Regions:
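Peptidyl-prolyl cis-trans isomerase
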Residues: 41, 45, 94-101, 108, ...
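Active-site recognition of the HExxH zinc-binding catalytic motif
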Residues: 29-41, 300
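Alpha-helical secondary-structure segments
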Residues: 139-143, 161, 295
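Carboxylate/His-rich catalytic cores and anion/metal-binding grooves
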Residues: 161-173
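Proteolytic maturation boundary segments
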Residues: 2, 231-271, 276-277, 281, ...
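Short, surface-exposed beta-strand/loop micro-motifs that present aromatic residues
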Residues: 1-5, 114, 210-215, 263-270, ...
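Non-catalytic, conformational "gating/processing" segments within enzyme and secreted inhibitor domains
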Residues: 154-158, 172, 176, 206-242, ...
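M16 family metallopeptidases and their MPP-like homologs
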Residues: 3, 8-24, 30-31, 48-143, ...
């Protein structure tokens, strides 16, 4: 996916993988997220002082993790015995590791915003590079994804454990996960969180991570999304030069776990120190369906930050605090989420009734005729603003690829939305929002006595080589690039 945009001598680079937490094995949730972290650790070519000496130690560590996860959680003696071996050998292996070589190399290219993220159906690796560094960046990324080496793994566990513990303490995260669990009692959207379950986090498998990488990180399941100042023909040749030898494998398959219709209200309570709040959600069909398009319009009728029914009738009238709604369009299913907080003296149940009352207004058509046209104008303006930045354009590419929507259809989305009438929205609301087909999560203020914690095992601090450099880094840094020619404004 390429779009040339000569706004500045920069290029936004997003490498997207059509795989996320929904693709995790049932017995190893959190795996996609672990892998994202490990893709910053290097390969057999960089990130190591001597890979031939490092590899036998890494192989031992991988085998020990398999032994560790096979031991019952209650067998603390044997688990501690094996963990002590993992910790000890990891310290030896770390003596060969060169820390942060990937970050050093992209920084040397002049990259900004280096990052990555994992969600339920995608993993995306991000950089913003100078336009004269495209070839070096392509060379580096091709090497990065050729054969990643999962070194310094047990210290990375500590980072992931801390992420999990923060999530367990976060009221918003608890509400969100409870909402997904209620809406998707079968599908992985609700049953496999991105971070993973505590038992699986405590029993990680490097072997399973490698299997996941080999299955999903293949050229026919990945997309290079570039937006910026570059020449199309030259860039395509460079992509072919550095990525052309990647082996195409069988297209990964995913079996969608079908959900039965929701026929009675699903209520859940979560507890925490923050102010009371609620989430409410309805389930719909997935991306690139008529559901997803009319859902987008219905959501804007209800809440658009200024003239939606919730905005006018509830927020501006001070009937509740911070009410609103949002659509979440995913590949297999979508959801329409609602939220709000009570004002003093008000209950969460009253907040729920107020939000539902605005859905009833949509069903009755009690919104102005001009609102539908105004929503289209607002969506068009948002789209124009998004496409004015390289990051916005690259993100559009990612969305189309992940949702498996042909680019021409993705670009035609606004034209399809324009066809939707007020009556379509009224009919949609009456057909899909009833008094018994939603999930509601009440966030109560109080101590959450059910919060578990991920207890961190003993991890001995490791000594890594921070100043050393691999031959690959030295070679890459010595490669010359053309200087960027300044462009002066002509007044």
């Amino acid at each position: 996916y390429l779009t040339s945009y000569a706004d500045a001598p920069r290029v936004q680079t997003n490498i997207a993988v059509r795989a996320g937490s929904k693709n995790d094995p049932e017995n190893a949730t959190g795996l996609a997220h672990y892998l994202e972290h490990m893709l910053f650790k290097g390969t057999d070519v960089y990130g190591s002082l001597d890979y031939e000496k490092e590899k036998p130690l890494l192989d031992k560590i991988e085998n020990l993790y398999e032994e560790y996860r096979s031991i019952e959680m209650t067998d603390t003696i044997n688990r501690e015995r094996v963990w002590a071996q993992i910790d000890s050998i990891s310290g030896e292996a770390a003596k060969f590791a060169i820390a942060n070589e990937y970050d050093k190399m992209v920084t040397g290219l002049g990259a900004k915003g280096t990052n990555a993220y994992t969600s339920n159906e995608k993993t995306v690796y991000i950089n913003d590079i100078p336009s004269n560094q495209i070839e070096k960046w392509l060379k580096l990324e091709a090497e990065r994804f050729r054969y990643p080496v999962f070194r310094l793994f047990h210290t990375e566990l500590e980072t992931v454990y801390e992420e999990k513990n923060r999530g367990l303490d976060n009221d918003g995260r608890k509400m969100y996960e409870a909402l997904l669990d209620g809406l998707f009692p079968n599908h992985q959207y609700g049953q496999q969180t991105t971070i993973g379950t505590i038992p699986h986090l405590k029993n990680p498998s490097l072997t399973e991570i490698r299997k996941y990488f080999n299955k999903y990180y293949v050229p026919n399941n990945m997309a290079i999304c570039l937006s910026g100042d570059f020449d199309y023909d030259e860039t395509i040749k460079l992509i072919e030069k550095y990525w052309g030898e990647f082996e195409i494998k069988d297209q990964p398959t995913f079996e969608v776990r079908k959900e039965s219709p929701i026929t009675e209200v699903v209520e859940t309570e979560v507890w925490g120190p923050e102010a009371e709040r609620l989430y409410m959600g309805f389930r719909f069909n997935g991306a690139n369906t008529e559901d997803s398009r009319i859902l987008t319009m219905t959501d804007m009728v209800l809440s658009n930050s200024s003239a939606g029914l919730i905005d006018l009738n509830l927020n501006q009238s001070q009937e509740l605090i911070g009410g609103g709604c949002f659509p979440m369009i995913m590949k297999d299913y979508s959801l329409h989420g609602f939220y709000g907080s009570p004002k003093p003296g008000q209950t969460l149940e009253e907040v729920k009734d107020l939000l539902l009352s605005q859905i009833e207004e949509v069903k009755k058509g009690n919104f102005p005729d001009w609102l539908v046209g105004a929503i289209i104008s607002d969506l068009k303006l948002s789209q124009i603003k998004k496409m004015e930045s390289n990051s916005g354009r690259a993100n559009e590419f990612v969305d189309a690829f992940i949702l498996d929507i042909p680019w021409n259809e993705h670009q035609n989305e606004m034209a399809e939305l324009e066809k939707i009438t007020k009556q379509d929205i009224i009919d949609f609301a009456n057909e899909n929002y009833s008094d018994n087909n939603y999930v509601i999560v009440y966030k109560r203020t109080g101590e959450d006595t059910s919060i578990p914690k991920v207890e961190k095992p003993i991890i001995t601090p490791v000594s890594v080589n921070r100043e050393d450099q691999s031959d690959f880094l030295v070679s890459l840094s010595e490669e010359k690039v053309k200087d960027i020619e300044p462009v002066f404004l002509n007044f």
